[in-house]
Swiss-Prot record:
Its main location: plastid. It comes from Cyanidioschyzon merolae (strain NIES-3377 / 10D). It is found in: Plastid, Chloroplast membrane. Keywords: Chloroplast, Membrane, Plastid, Transmembrane, Transmembrane helix. This is Tic20 family protein Ycf60.
Length: 197
């Protein structure tokens, strides 16, 4: 009983924070407008790469974490894409390696911010994939208990929070400051090769 009440309390807090951030984003966009440092195409490319960790997260824990209207929204918006992604897991693997060598390592000439965001999206994808695979390797009895539910909830919240924050920073044309993940992404793009002048 207390777990259900605590879950609803956490959901209300997350929704309040989300609404507050949404209002702040709308105010900031209306005040400043979008910065011209990144083009719309570059931003869309970054948004597309942040979809990869979302698909991976939804594959591992989406239906188990979501319920009610969120599950209906999930089925209408991402459900078919997640089914294709989970049916052919080699697609995510191929996208990961192709984008790493083409964009992050500098075969294609793109701006450093784009390389940073693509690298960060790939790192979040890799972490989500590893943690999700480890959780799926646990016995079913553990996953059905409170420990498994808590682990899936934490994976979902951390992945979605990171992706939402990073997408907000892409929208503003800025770099993110996620602990450890941003530092690893900076290390990947600091060599200066493949940078668009």
């Amino acid at each position: 009983m207390w777990i259900i009440i605590a879950s609803y309390g956490v959901l209300i807090i997350v929704l309040a924070i989300g609404i507050g951030v949404g209002v702040g984003v709308i105010r900031k966009v209306l005040k400043k407008g979008m910065k011209a440092e990144m083009t719309i195409g570059e931003r869309m490319l970054c948004f597309g790469y942040y979809l990869l960790p979302v698909l991976e997260c939804m594959t591992h824990c989406g239906p188990d974490v979501l319920n009610g209207w969120m599950k209906g929204l999930y089925k209408r918006s991402l459900g078919d894409l997640v089914v294709v992604y989970s049916t052919y897991p080699i697609l995510g693997f191929m996208i990961f390696f192709m984008s790493y060598f083409l964009l992050v390592r500098g075969i294609l000439q793109v701006r450093k911010k784009v390389r940073f965001h693509v690298s960060q999206a790939l790192i979040i994808y890799l972490l989500t994939s590893i943690i999700g695979s480890l959780l799926n390797a646990l016995p079913e009895m553990i996953l059905m208990g409170w420990f498994g539910s808590t682990c899936l909830d934490i994976l979902f919240i951390l992945t979605m929070g990171s992706v939402i924050y990073a997408s907000y920073q892409v929208w503003n044309g800025e770099l993110t400051r996620l602990p450890l993940i941003s530092e690893a992404a900076k290390l990947q793009v600091q060599d200066g090769e493949g940078e668009k002048k």
